[in-house]
């Protein structure tokens, strides 16, 4: 009698080759070399080799380098041989730890306490990879990200970018120039604001502004008593962005392009309530963020256009160059 082919009886032609991998628990430095043809097989061997109790299953496999969760077989097959995995039980979370060269292990109890520092350790690497893919993304970075890359030792950043230390020193110098330019722009805006304030006082406009602010304050109080609290709860901005908006002069120069876009999309009234501002100030800051975002995107687009133009004009390797025209004899 012929047996029907099911999930337990794979086609011999579909048998996948074994992939060598390295396994470890997230609280141990000991790692084991295993070979598996699928994620399910790797999970099974992880439970067996690492003595993970069945009560702690299902386990999650993450890349030891950056904590990426691996739950897709096709992605698993694309990984190189001897990829390092960390096996996480159901009550554990991955966190970056640089003390052992980038391998991660942490128990659930210590996860919350160590989270900020570890995230910062991973964040600069993610920003560095972004620059590696497209150098023009420097324009889109926040001041915090720019400073983080400047503070990283040259050797570490060079290793992450696969560049020489001399090249990375030039890059860090460029990053510092971008920071300096934003600071100069901030100081210029502050001076302009002071000048405008002086003009307002001389022109006796201040009294009119007080009346306007009083009216806006009454409007804001009405919002607070009714819809205001609901709007404040609807603000989706991170607390770090709100702090930057409230405390930094010319905050649009400190934010990343992604943060600028988030601020631009917020409801002005909700933003005003969240920051305890009048609506006019919230709208002014939103407009500044929108303008700064458009400027950065335009700069990136210009860089890409110049790059494409340069690539079209440069002959490909092996491509014959056009012969230059001979100069006419003036005699």
Curated annotation (Swiss-Prot):
The modification Phosphothreonine is found at residue 243. The keyword Iron-sulfur does not apply. The modification N-acetylmethionine is found at residue 1. CDD domains: CIDE_N_ICAD. The record marks 117-118, 224-225 as: Cleavage. It is found in: Cytoplasm. InterPro entries: CIDE-N_dom, DFF-C, DFF45, DNA_fragmentation_mid_dom. Pfam families: CIDE-N, DFF-C. Inhibitor of the caspase-activated DNase (DFF40). This is DNA fragmentation factor subunit alpha. It comes from Mus musculus.
């Amino acid at each position: 009698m012929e047996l029907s082919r099911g999930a337990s009886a794979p086609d011999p032609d579909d048998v996948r080759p074994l992939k060598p991998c390295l396994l470890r628990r997230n609280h141990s430095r000991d790692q084991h070399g295993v070979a598996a043809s699928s994620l399910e097989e790797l999970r099974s061997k992880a439970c067996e080799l690492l003595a993970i109790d069945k009560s702690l299953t299902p386990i999650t496999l993450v890349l030891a380098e950056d904590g990426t969760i691996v739950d897709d077989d096709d992605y698993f097959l694309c990984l190189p041989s001897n990829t390092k995995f960390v096996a996480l039980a159901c009550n554990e979370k991955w966190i970056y730890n640089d003390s052992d060269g980038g391998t991660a292990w942490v128990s659930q109890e210590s996860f919350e306490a160590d989270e900020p520092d570890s995230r910062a350790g991973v964040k600069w690497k993610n920003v560095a990879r972004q620059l590696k893919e497209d150098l023009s993304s420097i324009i889109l970075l926040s001041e915090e990200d720019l400073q983080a890359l400047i503070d990283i030792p040259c050797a570490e950043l060079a290793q992450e970018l696969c560049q020489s230390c001399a090249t990375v020193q030039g890059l860090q110098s460029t990053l510092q120039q971008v920071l300096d330019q934003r600071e100069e722009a901030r100081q210029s805006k502050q001076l302009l604001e002071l000048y405008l304030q002086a003009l307002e006082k001389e022109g006796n406009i201040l009294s009119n502004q007080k009346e306007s602010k009083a009216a806006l304050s009454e409007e804001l109080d009405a919002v607070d008593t009714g819809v205001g609290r609901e709007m404040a709860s609807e603000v989706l901005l991170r607390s770090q962005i709100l702090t930057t908006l409230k405390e930094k002069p010319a905050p649009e120069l400190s934010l990343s392009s992604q943060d600028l876009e988030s601020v631009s999309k917020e409801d002005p009234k909700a933003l005003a309530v969240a920051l305890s501002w009048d609506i006019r100030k919230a709208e002014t800051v939103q407009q500044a963020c929108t303008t700064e975002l458009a400027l950065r995107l335009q700069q990136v687009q210009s860089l890409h256009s110049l790059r494409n133009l340069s690539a079209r004009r440069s002959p490909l390797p092996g491509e014959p160059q056009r012969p230059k025209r001979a100069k006419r004899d003036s005699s």
